[in-house]
Curated annotation (Swiss-Prot):
Keywords: Cytoplasm, Exonuclease, Hydrolase, Nuclease. 3'-to-5' exoribonuclease specific for small oligoribonucleotides. It comes from Photorhabdus laumondii subsp. laumondii (strain DSM 15139 / CIP 105565 / TT01) (Photorhabdus luminescens subsp. laumondii). The active site is at Y129. It is found in: Cytoplasm. This is Oligoribonuclease. NCBIfam families: PRK05359.1. It comes from the Bacteria. Residues 8-171 form the Exonuclease domain. Belongs to the oligoribonuclease family. It is an enzyme of class 3 (hydrolase). Its EC number is 3.1.15.-. GO terms for cellular component: cytoplasm. InterPro entries: Exonuclease_RNaseT/DNA_pol3, Oligoribonuclease, RNaseH-like_sf, RNaseH_sf.
Length: 181
């Protein structure tokens, strides 16, 4: 498969919290799929260095989750800053999708986009202005066909690459069991 405007860019960020004015990106990963959700390639998974002072601002949930996954140690050991992570991610995406072609894809991606806008604006601008947010279908299924949610199993590791793989699989599940295409 080659570069195509029909390919989709999936992204997930792990952050120190939910407020882009205070919190920071600590991990970024991307996956490119074709329009039928077949994974074409996985981009770099990058732990983004943040200071001990920044990490100390995390709440209990983030400390527990990101320490338990090993991400905090990876962030402390990383030499890669926001700009370097942004550049490496764009270099990967340029091989698969023209700039401005793909919506930003994933779960609750408006939150990711807020952080990209603040800390990785060139990457944020690489996406089309539209969103393909799997959490929209999750909310609709919860209200209109809740019985299908029992068949959806997620690990919720809160590791960026795992989360993206689960988002792609979740959309494929909804396509088959909810949208029924």
């Amino acid at each position: 498969m080659s570069k195509s405007e029909h390919n989709l860019i999936w992204i997930d960020l792990e952050m120190t919290g939910l407020d882009p004015e205070r919190d920071r990106i600590i991990e970024i990963a991307t996956i490119v799929t074709d329009a039928n959700l077949n994974i074409l390639d996985e981009g770099p998974v990058i732990a983004v260095h943040q200071s001990d002072e920044q990490l100390a601002l995390m709440d209990k949930w983030n400390v527990r989750t990101h320490t338990g996954s090993g991400l905090v140690e990876r962030v402390k050991a990383s030499k890669i800053d926001d700009r370097e992570a942004e550049k490496a991610t764009i270099e990967f995406l340029e091989k698969w999708v023209p700039a401005g072609a793909s919506p930003i894809c994933g779960n609750s991606v408006s939150q990711d986009r807020r952080f990209l806008f603040r800390y990785m604006p060139e990457l944020e601008a690489y996406f089309h202005y539209r969103y393909l947010d799997v959490s929209t279908l999750k909310e609709l299924a919860r209200r209109w066909k809740p019985e299908i949610l029992a068949g959806l199993k997620k690990q919720n590791t809160h590791q960026a690459l795992d989360d993206i793989r689960e988002s792609v699989a979740e959309l494929a599940y909804y396509r088959e069991h909810f949208i029924q295409l």
